[in-house]
Structure formats: structure tokens, C-alpha cells
């Protein structure tokens, strides 16, 4: 098969032939066959967010390091921070995470994250805060500032700390890209 490979030089959105949107972080790459619409498979290196276009009777697969995600039409994010740490976060819809070496399958629900180590095939599922994601943006409405900081720390693997005392808990309404 002939492949098309897209390498993100900066954060960018790429639209696949089936209208699926992929928001790629700088340095990430995806590849797929020229006959993509016949078999919807993508191979990912790096971090990307997928908004999969739903096609009745047609699955969508994303291959990562010794595992793959099977999708039916949904929004999810994949972070591959190093050779030992892969994270898949489901925002809405339903996906199935598959470990190739063990055959383990995890059906994910919205607001769940699977952490996967491809070196030993270990998986861990945890619930994350309810996050609204649309068109490349995380959207918040009257979210308490402490909760917003916790979400930002999860998403961007940062360590922001809120200091000071407030008589009233500040909140945030807006979007973060």
C-alpha cells in the first residue's frame, strides 16, 4: 500500500479524506493509506486529538505503540509523552482500546482516561473531570478556578498552583486551545 504521511511543524488541524478532524501537536505525525476510505486506519506518533466522522458500518482505527483504538464516531485525545507512557482520554462517544500483545480490550466511556505502558502492556483506567471539547478548544462555563487549574494541569501536564485566599471562589467562562 502507498501511504500519505503528515508531520506537524506546529500545532495544526488536518482533515482526513473521510472528514475526520485531527488536531496535531507540533512534532506529531500521522500516516494513512491512499485507499483510506476503504479501510479507515491511521498510525500516530506523538499527541493528537481526533474528532472522528461517523460512517455507518465502518470502523476507524488509530494505531499507537503496540496497541490500537477502535472508534465508531467520537472525540478523544491521545498523548504519547515517552516510550513508556501513552494516555487516551475520551471526551464523548465510545471507543475500544486494544492491547495487541495480550488481547486486552477496554471499552471506554466519556470522561475516562486509559494510561498504557507498551513495554509491559500494563493499563490503568481512571475517571477524569467532565471536559467539553469542540473545534480544537476546551470550553468552560462558570467552572471554579480551582477545578479549571486541575483540568489544565491534567491536559498540559503542568503544575499550576493557585495561591491566596478568596472570599468567593472565582470562576472561569471561556475557551482554551
Regions found by a protein language model. Give the residues of each.
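A residue-level detector for the "anchor" residue at the start of short, highly conserved motifs
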Residues: 1-177
